[in-house]
Amino acid sequence: MARSHDTKGSGGLSQRQLRVGEQVRHTLAQVLQRGEIRDDLIERTVISVSEVRMSPDLKIATCFITPLGSADPQAVIKALASHAKFIRGRVAPSLAQMKYMPEFRFRPDTSFDNFSKIDALLRSPEVARDLSHDDDEDGGADEAPRNGDE
């Protein structure tokens, strides 16, 4: 599931960056799901890998993660970062076609928080009032005259 994190430059991401990022995301999610990383915090936390963003040279993989439950995101990120070389070795077989294995960087995925803030704003009474007011104004003007009503 792609997230809308800020990108540098106006070109966006290339097809290769997107393809490799998705391949890394899928493999990383499998490594986490199988419990291959021997760390108490990582083993007892369900971690969702929502996106992996590759650098233009494909040497850096920025992984956006969300720990599900009550786990502290920063503690989980710190634990994952301490096992980055092990993770790199586990992901390497799925990226055998690449010249270099990417360096892993872990970041919290804040897109869900942003979506919930936007949802709360859209559900606020002020917005509902404005939307109903706009509907009332537009409702009469948009109707086409019927035969005999002119």
From Swiss-Prot:
Keyword check for ATP-binding, yes or no.
Answer: no
Picking any one GO molecular function of the record gives: ribosomal small subunit binding
The source's superkingdom equals Bacteria
What's a single GO BP term from this record? maturation of SSU-rRNA
Location(s) in or outside the cell: Cytoplasm
InterPro entries, per the entry: KH_dom-like_a/b (IPR015946), RbfA (IPR000238), RbfA_dom_sf (IPR023799), Ribosome-bd_factorA_CS (IPR020053)
Oligomer and partners: Monomer. Binds 30S ribosomal subunits, but not 50S ribosomal subunits or 70S ribosomes.
Q: Which family does it belong to?
A: Belongs to the RbfA family.
Query: What is this protein's record name?
Result: Ribosome-binding factor A
Q: Highest lineage ranks of the organism?
A: Bacteria, Pseudomonadati, Pseudomonadota, Alphaproteobacteria, Hyphomicrobiales
